[in-house]
Amino acid sequence: MGDLSDRLAFADATEQAALVASGEASPAELVDAAVARIERLDPALGALVAESFDQARAEAAGELPDGPFRGVPFLLKDAVQHSAGDRYQHGMTFLRDNAWVSPEDSELTRRYRAAGLVLLGRTKVPEFTISPTTEPLAHGPARNPWDPERSPGGSSGGSAVAVASGMVPV
């Protein structure tokens, strides 16, 4: 997977979707490459608060909607949009061990899935999603991939880190 994985690292979502549509790559290959990058980079950068790699691999191996982004891996921000069965904390310390579990996908998540996107997990946000930096006490800071001593900003700091480092295209 080396050549494909390297090619995907900074390929945008439309390029990745085109690889699937042309048969040059499968959704499973896209997901595996993204998971490998996340596992390699996230320990130092701290973009994610939760992963759902097994579920993503199962989805990618099965039938996906024939949407414009079929097979493209993505991450949800840990606020507002929800996916069924996932625990949400919204960056809040008091929800770290008492997180709300979503009974269903939010409308936005349903639309993402209908477009063919494959959910790999959720990204860090500041506590209450209101700080200009993503440094939640509950999970530690997200780090700028170009200068780990700096914040990627907020409230989408974890998402910014994931895209800027090539973990996922969206």
What are these regions (language model features)?
Residues 1-55:
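An N-terminal boundary/leader segment
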Residues 23-24, 63, 77:
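Short acidic-aromatic low-complexity motifs
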Residues 20, 37-38, 63-64, 115, ...:
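Alpha-helix boundary/capping residues
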Residues 70-170:
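Short glycine/serine-rich loop/turn segments
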Residues 54-61, 116-117:
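Long amphipathic alpha-helix in the N-terminal Rossmann-like dinucleotide-binding domain
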Residues 16-20, 60, 159:
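Generic hydrophobic alpha-helical segments
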Residues 6-9, 65-72:
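Flexible N-terminal pre-Rossmann segment of NAD(P)-dependent oxidoreductases
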